[in-house]
Amino acid sequence: MRFGIFGSAQAKRGGPDVDSGAGFRDFVEHNVEAEALGYHSSFVVEHHFTGFGQISATLNLLTWVGARTTTLRLGTAVMTLPWHNPVLLAEQAATIDLLSGGRLDFGVGQGYRHNEFAGFCLPMEEAEGRFEESLGVIIKAWTSDTPWSHHGKHWRFEGVVVEPPTAQKPHPPIWMGAGRPASIKKVAAHGFNLLLDQFAPIDQIGERIALFRSEVEGRGCVFDPMRVAVTRSVHVSMTAAEREKALQTRVAARQRMDRLAQRPDGQNRASIMSYAHTLEAAEAGALYGTPDEIAAKLQMLRDVGAEYVLVNSAGGRESLRRFAREVVPAFSGEPALRS
């Protein structure tokens, strides 16, 4: 199996006595240690207008991480394309790919939080159309060495050559967040890699991987399990009381996230909004417990086809260390053959 990390940093607000940058600097050190522990990648979120300091300038922070590391893959999970000028985003992403020596994993999505679209004064109804148009522009920008133009519904560019070029050819790997069947089929149709969220229970993860594999193979391609990354929250070595407290914290975070994401009419059909706000649901999508308990859950994930797991360390850096040292070694072999 392969393991990366997933997450965010927080910048606290306050007066002159508050070090607002401490959380970001700690996150960079978290990534430096993750590389030393053998983690393969770091995927970082993009969110806006939360009120609790989530990462908004994802590529900026990843550039800093890239400068402090040498092998860690630098992933976005995800850049929400409807909010960005696609040519400018292509330039920024190419720059970090060059500076890092070709380590960018470009994760993209169309967004699901209503408050973010409202903050940017963009109708959520335009999300899919903007996403598809921007994605096409970005790929065109990365693969064209001569001037080109684009006249679309949302964007127009005339005679542009996007600089700099990317280090990876024809462009950095593209990962796409998806959960619903139609979205998963779209990922396969594009030939992209699949990012799966951190809340789905194991059986649902298996169904999504099976669908993606079927779609990939149905197009005459060989399925590579490393083209699917599954995110899981991890907290190692807890008492029963600590586990319940951690799960309650997880449920509260989900509720806070859903309040930000919900449309005024209550109609948000994103798959990430479909999970129950219960302790049972929280535990079903997490790897919480002793190393042995976590290993058992991880084996269940592997049994349904997951070979690449991104861990969001709810237990902090010590959990990251213990997971790497006490859980990962048992899963470092080759994947089992599946029919």
PLM features per residue range, with description:
Residues M1-L74, P172:
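N-terminal beta1-alpha1-beta2 module of alpha/beta enzyme domains
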Residues R2-A22, W83-S149, N193-L195, A200-G206, ...:
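Flexible, glycine-rich active-site loops centered on histidine and acidic residues
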Residues F3-G7, S42-V44, L74-T76, L104-V108, ...:
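Hydrophobic faces of well-ordered beta-strands that scaffold small-molecule active sites
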Residues I5-G7, E125-V162, D203-A306, S332-S339:
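An alpha-helical appendage that flanks or caps ligand/catalytic pockets
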Residues A9-F24, M79-V87, Q168-A178, V234-S237, ...:
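Active-site mouth loops of central-metabolism enzymes
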Residues E35-A36, L62-T71, A93, D97-L104, ...:
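Acidic (Asp/Glu)-rich catalytic clusters
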Residues G38, E46, V65, I96, ...:
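Conserved, mostly hydrophobic/aromatic
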Residues F52-T76, R130-S134, A324-R338:
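Alpha-helix-loop-beta-strand connector modules within alpha/beta enzyme cores
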